[in-house]
């Protein structure tokens, strides 16, 4: 099982008491890059032939299975970041890497592919972008303005705050039931919410929420679940259920 990816800085880890998680993730970042660059397990030895990179996608799938998609995305995006002025990066890859790294740690030293040709990494990046986009996850573009009060509305959780096994759009949609974090101007962070897909209740922080879902993006199944929840009457707020984060 892959070591859980920690996407924040050491300062944040120290503040939150997550230094062990930070170090374990940092070490796994290094193992990931070593694996991809190794003479025996690496990309060149296993997925590069006749100038074709990972033709069937099997090598990328293997790396994702071993290290997790978020870590693979980080290593590739970090590689772009470390040589952002290299003109061989495609505009799509450069923009993706910039957006990805904005929401991740600003410490770039650990976890980048220094021994793989830029053109090869660029192709690998295009492949993982395509795979990621295929998940059809909700993003900020599906949400209303941040000034909206979230209580009583369908909110979109940031999948980056979840374990990768829950990186599915149905797990992102929740009914916000309360908490000071629902209010855009409040100092509180807590957002209590019920997952529309399975009914589990959990406490999130406001930064884990992308926003309130625009009505036109609400799937039919979610609309039905929402009506069921609204018709059951008020329930006592509680945390618990599955641990998505």
Label for each model-derived stretch:
Residues 1-245:
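Gram-negative host-targeted secretion-system effectors, predominantly Type III and Type IV
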């Amino acid at each position: 099982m892959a070591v859980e990816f920690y996407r924040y800085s050491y300062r944040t880890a120290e503040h939150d008491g997550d230094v062990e998680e930070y170090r374990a993730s940092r070490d796994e970042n290094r193992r990931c890059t070593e694996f991809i660059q190794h003479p025996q397990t690496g990309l060149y030895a296993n997925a590069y032939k006749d100038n074709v990179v990972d033709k069937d996608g099997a090598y990328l799938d293997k790396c994702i299975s071993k290290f997790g998609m978020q870590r693979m995305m980080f290593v590739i995006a970090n590689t772009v970041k470390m040589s952002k002025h290299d003109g061989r990066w495609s505009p799509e890859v450069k923009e993706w890497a910039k957006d990805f790294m904005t929401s991740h740690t600003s410490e770039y030293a650990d976890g980048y592919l220094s021994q793989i040709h830029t053109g090869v990494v660029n192709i690998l990046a295009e492949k993982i972008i395509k795979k990621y986009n295929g998940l059809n996850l909700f993003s900020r573009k599906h949400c209303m303005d941040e000034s909206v009060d979230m209580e009583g509305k369908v909110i979109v959780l940031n999948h980056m705050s979840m374990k990768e096994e829950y990186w599915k759009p149905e797990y992102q949609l929740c009914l916000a039931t309360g908490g000071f974090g629902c209010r855009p101007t409040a100092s509180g962070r807590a957002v209590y919410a019920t997952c529309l897909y399975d009914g589990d209740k959990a406490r999130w922080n406001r930064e884990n929420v992308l926003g309130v879902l625009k009505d036109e993006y609400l799937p039919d199944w979610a609309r039905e679940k929402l009506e069921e929840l609204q018709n059951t009457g008020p329930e006592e707020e509680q945390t618990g259920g599955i641990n998505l984060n």
